[in-house]
Every structure is written in structure tokens, then in C-alpha cells.
Amino acid sequence: MSLMKERKPKKPHYIPRPPGKPFKYKCFQCPFTCNEKSHLFNHMKYGLCKNSITVVTDQDRIIKNPKVNSMDQNQTSNEPFAKSSVPAINSSLESKMLHSVAREEAKENLDLKNEPKSHAEKTTVSKEFTLSPPVAISQINKPPSLDGVMRPSAFIPVGEHRVKKGAENRTIPELTSISAEPAKGVHSIKSAFHSLPTPWKSGLVSPDFSQKSSIPRYIRPMISEYPPQFYSEAGLPAVFSPYLFPQTECENPMLSIYSTPDQRPYLPHPLQPSGLPLPKPINAPFEHYRLLQQFQQNPQLHYGFYRPTEHPYFSYGLKVPPAPGLSKEHTSQSMDSPTFIYPSSHPSRLYPLEGFQKLFEIQKETPPVLAKNLDSKSDSESVKMSPRAGSAATGSPERPSPTNFTQSSQGHEGIFDLSTKSISTSDKIGKDFTSGKAMRKSTDSQTIISRENSPSFGNDGVQSHSEGITVTDDAVHDDTIAPLNLSKKSEVESRDIVDTVNNSDFTNERVGFMEMQDLPLNLSVKDSGSNHNTLCADERVLLPRQSTSPPVYQAIQTTDNRAPTTTGIHSLGIIENCDEQKQSAAVALCQLATSSPGVPPRGTEDEFPEKETVVPEQVQPRSPAAQETETDVGARGQKRTNSKELGKSQSSTKKQKAVDSGRMFTLRKRPRVS
């Protein structure tokens, strides 16, 4: 509207011209007419039909009758069944007169006053001609009714109404009946669109309602038949069925497949037009799958569905009570199949009361089972100690409580008492695969370091490496089996002693390796300690070369290898080992989940304190890497008293003793106090 005003401040184009004017252009949807095509274009462009309709409806009440008469008379003259050439000529003259009158009225805005005049003129003109008064009345009254029906549609119905108009001209009683309609016609003209819908709806809505009424006839039985059969029994179970059907039915593989077909009947049924055939296609899938199984078990299906559906959530042996009609065997076997995912627990074979206990025990037993696979132990041996208190990791790995679980060492109780306590902790940690792996890493790295330091590193290193692995594995599982298996440890010690006799360099590292093996495994014995004491002098002589050897750096690959870095140097002797192992290697072992390296026998410790004071003077050269590692380990040195002392004795090195003797004693005393 604003754009139109800006372009042309003329009178609005969308207002229809005065009724009598011959219009070249007319709107399809509304009574708007204009001689200028651009006006009609704008009218259509801006959707001004509403405005024109409102204006026309206001004017129709006043002016439209003359306009309609002129228009309709022109149209009737064109029709083949027009009354006669005389009335057509009269209508043309009358229309011209009305056009002139209407133009003047529109310009002067005297439409209301001029309407009766034009109406009277129409009647006089029509009466002057030979038309009979009823025919004239029909001409005057009929067009508005026809126009009322004709104008709103402007499409197909117009021709029909014109045909009706010709037929009505022939019969006077019809004209009189139509003459009663002008009021209706005028009212329908108010909105050019509303007059059409009333007959249109009346014609079409009735069949629509008939169709709709027929549709609910089909839909209602569908909806009514649906819920009782499907939603109560089949619908909900179908969702949960894959676990439940094998329970309820005796291990039928088809049931898990058919659980989805249960849902399939939902989709086709609403599509089926008639309600009566519904139960037949519904029953067809039921008869294939259910008639033999579920229809026999209808009461059981509810329980089988609603109770066991919880089963997948209690996958570990917490078996939901079986359906009342089902034997426990069926349910348990059927529930096994989904739960094979969890091999450790066999929940189906456990009744609900026993499920917690047996599962707990079985899960405890599983780590030893894995240990069996590692060490190829017999099942009975590995499982023997698993649930017992000795293997329970009550104390923290850093500070295991030695007093909680004391296991009597079989052959060596008398040697030292603390070894048993540390053994219990070692058993605890041996249970843990992570700690076991860490111990293996430490021992392996220690052996590698000692071999690297030794001249015979090429072959012996590999052997000792493999031996260290086997020894630690055996030790871990021997601890789980029995409090102490010193048989293999004694063998290792004997091997190491023989090696020390044969190769002095190799013996130093071998003894260090032995002690590394013995300490985490609590195999330190006075006999072995005395043997090492005899060897200490030789080892001291040999150590400077070994400690300074560069390969020590290779051991610093993992956090667990801190002990190895110092342990390669530890081959001084048990005297020196007691000092520095307590400081460094034990710290690394504590970091290894405190695999409870066996405390050196107290007798040896008591024998060595004087020698320990002497040792720092004797031992001088040392690799800087070993010093750094020792300082780090000493700073990290932690709460394990006896295990620390043994580990520290392993980490002894000459130069570090000369430098840090005071610090080492302080660290040594701390673990002793604890």
C-alpha cells in the first residue's frame, strides 16, 4: 500500500470503478475490475482482494443492483437462450444509461441517493418495452441472485448458473422462487468466497462424513483388538524377549528370532482396512511360533517376561527367581547362554542365595588361574591360598601391616622373624599381577645391569635374565601356594655361589642378583649371608669396575628399574648391600608395590654394623648415574623397614658411600626404628 501511494498518489486503483462502466480487466478472486491492466496487476501482486471485497460489499448493498443488472443483462443477451433481441437491445440501452448515471454518482459520492433513481429508471425503461411485468420483475430481481452465485466463483459455476438462469427465464414459478433469493444473493456477495463454500460443502461434506463414518468402523475394531493381545502379552515381551524366550520355551533357537516378528504384526495391522481380518493375520505368526509354546504358557509368559527381564542386569549369577511354571533347570540353562559373556562367574548354576558367595570366591580364584597360565602351575596349588587371609592385601602396598598375617616359614623360621611378616606382604603382593610384573621388571633389569657390569655379560646376562623371570614367577606363586618355598631359592643361591667361585666378576653380579631375588622373595638366609660375607672382600675389589661401567644407564627405562641401576653396583657384599640396599633398592621395591623383599637376617645385620661404618671408606669410585639414581631413590625412600634395608643393601655403590655415608646411616636407622 505504501509503495503504491509513493508511486501514484492517485485514488487507489484497487477500488472498483463505478458499477456501470465497461471494464476490460477483472480480478479472478474478487469483484475488482479496472480498465487499466497495471491496476489489476498491482491488485493481484499485492493481494488486495480483501480490500476490494470489503469495499464492494459496502457498495453492493447500495449500488450493486444497477451494476449487476447492467452486467447480467449484457451477459444474458450473449447467451443462445436469451429471451429475445428486443430485450437484449433494451438491456444494452439500459446499461448505457446506468453507466452514465453511475459514473456521475461515483464522482459526486451520491451513491445512496442515486441508487433508488437508477432503480426506478431501470423499471421504467424495462416497462416501456414489450416485456410483461412479471418478466421485467424477473429480469430485475433475477440477475442479483444469479450474480450473487456467479460473482464469487468467477470460474466453472458461472456457466452453470447462467444455464440455470436461461432455464429459469422459461418458467415463471422458478423465477418467482429465485426472485425470493436476491437477499440471499446479496448477502453471499458480501464475501465473494463464502457464497461458494456453502453449496460446495453441502455437496461434498456429506460424502466425506460418510467415508469418515465408514473408516472408524474399520479403525475401532483394530484398536480394540490391538491392546489385549499385543500390548499385554506380546508387545512388552517382544522388547525383552531375546533373553526370556529361551527360558520360557525349551531352548528353541527360533524364539529369539521370532521376538522381532512379534513386533511385525503391529505395522501391517493398522494398514489393513477391515477390522475383521485382523485377528487372522495376527494369529498366523502366532501359530507358527507361539501356538505350541506361548498359548500353552499364557500365564507363564507374563512372569517369564516381567520377572526375568531384569536378569540381564544381574548378569553375574544373581538369578531372578524363575517363572512359576518353569523348572529351574530350564531357566538356568537358558540364562547361561547370554551370560557366557562373563566366563569368570557361572551365575546360572548358582541359586540366588549362593550366588554372592560362590561368585565372590570364583572371582577371587580367577587371578591365581591366570597365574597358573603364567607359571604352568596345577589348578589346585594356585587356588589353594587365594581366599585365605595370608594373600589378602590388608595393608597398603607401601605400609603393609606385618602383624596382621604371620605365616611360619617352613625351614627358616628360626633365622629371622621379620622375614615371615615381609613374606606375608610379599604373598599379598604376589597375588597382584601388576606387582608381580613390577618385581619381574626390577629383577630382570637388575640382572641385566649386573651382566652388563660383568665381563661375561654376553651369555650370562641372558641366562640370568631368564632365570630372574622364572624365579620371580615361581616365588610369587610359591608364596601363594605356601608361605615359603625356599627350595628353588636355595638352588638359585647355590648356583650363584658356584658362579662367584668360578667368575669373580660374574659372582659379584650373581650374588647381587641372588640377593635381588632373595630380598623381594624373603629368601635371605644367614647361610647365604655368611657366604656373601666371605665374598665381600673379593666383591669390594671387583666393584669399582662394575660400578663405573656405563651400561648402568640402560636400566633406567622404567620407574621400577631404579633399583636395577643401583643393584648392578650392589655386588659389593652383604655388608655394603645392607647399607645401600636399605636406602635405594628397597625404595624401588616399595615402589614396586612393596613386593616385600625379605629382610636380611638380623644376625647378619647385627654382625655388619661395624663393617658398615668401615665400608664407606673402602668403597670410593662410583658412576654419576648411580649416584643420581641413589639420591632420587633415597629421597623417595619410604616406609617399609626391613624390605627397605634389603633393597638398600642391593643399591650400594662405592662413591656414593664415600659421599653420603651419613645420609645413608640416617636412612638406615629410620627403617630400623619402624
UniProtKB/Swiss-Prot annotation:
Alphabetical list of InterPro entries matching this protein: ZNF750, ZNF750_Znf
Record's function text: Transcription factor involved in epidermis differentiation.
Binding-site residues for Zn(2+), renumbered to this chain: C27, C30, H43, C49
GO function terms (MF aspect): DNA-binding transcription activator activity, RNA polymerase II-specific; promoter-specific chromatin binding; RNA polymerase II cis-regulatory region sequence-specific DNA binding; zinc ion binding
Location in the cell: Nucleus
Bias type Polar residues, positions: 401-411, 444-466
GO cellular component assignments: nucleus
GO biological process, one term: cell differentiation
Keyword Membrane: no
Predominant cellular place of this UniProt entry's protein: nucleus
Keywords, ordered alphabetically: Activator, Differentiation, Metal-binding, Nucleus, Transcription, Transcription regulation, Zinc, Zinc-finger
Segments for region (Disordered): 105-125, 370-466, 594-674
Zinc fingers (CCHC-type), renumbered ranges: 25-51
Protein name: Zinc finger protein 750
